[in-house]
A protein has these predicted regions:
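Charge-rich, well-structured scaffold segments of protease-associated domains
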Residues: 1-39, 76, 107-244
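His/Glu-based metal-binding/catalytic segments typifying zinc-dependent metallopeptidases
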Residues: 39-97
Length: 244
């Protein structure tokens, strides 16, 4: 696309044991001849708040197993609340000891798969919880079981043990992601592109996550993860449409 794939909308990160003057010369040789594109105007469309549950069905001829998607509108990635939602995602579904996985997949054998994640975007983001049923489990049953776990987060502080586990997980992931030159280069590029050019986040991001408290987790869940603020999508095989 000539509008977006242009030098003035690209980020080049060079990391490593480099000769800086020589590197700048090579960059100029390879990239300077590429013409600048038009200035890109960016706008932020304000959406009306979701105040009632939106229910929808979608049919796909290429799937055999249905799925439930619960989607909530959440704030842009460069906010504290977005980071808190990342923590909630890890608590709910990251790893076999996470609350939803342990409950629905391991213990109750209701689900083939469950996931919770915040799709971070620049303006609004989308928090998604999805699950695939196992056996005779209905999508409505999965919704009820998922909502039960979300309500616990909204009404109770998570345990100190779980909180410390989350802290350790985020520290481990951050260190691992930046353990080599390629990881550092990728982080710097992402911070510049998605966080208003703030590459200092490579030194601050971990502390931002570690500053999130148990009360923050409860308050953010109360603010965004409400049943009247979401889309409830039943994603179904085409054959189920024909049966109706």
């Amino acid at each position: 696309n000539k509008k977006y794939y242009v030098p003035n909308n690209a980020i080049l990160t060079v990391a490593g044991d480099i000769d800086i003057p020589q590197t700048k010369e090579w960059i100029s040789d390879y990239f300077a001849p590429i013409p600048r594109g038009v200035t890109i105007e960016r706008s932020f469309t304000k959406e009306r708040p979701i105040t009632e549950t939106i229910r929808a069905e979608a049919y796909d001829p290429n799937i055999q197993i249905p799925a439930i998607f619960l989607a909530y509108r959440t704030p842009g990635r460069n906010t504290r609340d977005a980071r808190v939602l990342d923590v909630i995602s890890t608590y709910l579904s990251k790893g076999k000891s996470s609350k939803l996985y342990k409950k629905l997949v391991d213990n109750q054998k209701m689900s083939l798969q469950v996931a919770a994640f915040n799709m971070n975007n620049e303006d609004y983001s989308t928090y998604v919880i999805l699950s695939l049923p196992l056996g005779e489990t209905t999508l409505s049953t999965l919704v009820a079981e998922i909502d039960e776990e979300v309500e616990k987060i909204k009404n109770e502080l998570i345990s100190e043990k779980d909180y410390q586990k989350l802290q350790n997980q985020f520290e481990s992931e951050f260190v691992s992601a930046n353990a080599n030159i390629a990881g550092i280069a990728n982080s710097l590029a992402e911070y510049y592109a998605f966080y208003d050019g703030n590459t200092d986040l490579i030194n601050e991001e971990l502390d931002l996550y570690k500053s999130i408290s148990r009360e923050d987790i409860r308050q953010v869940a109360r603010k965004y993860l409400n049943t009247n603020q979401r889309l409830e999508l039943h994603y179904l095989p085409e054959s189920q449409k024909e049966e109706k």
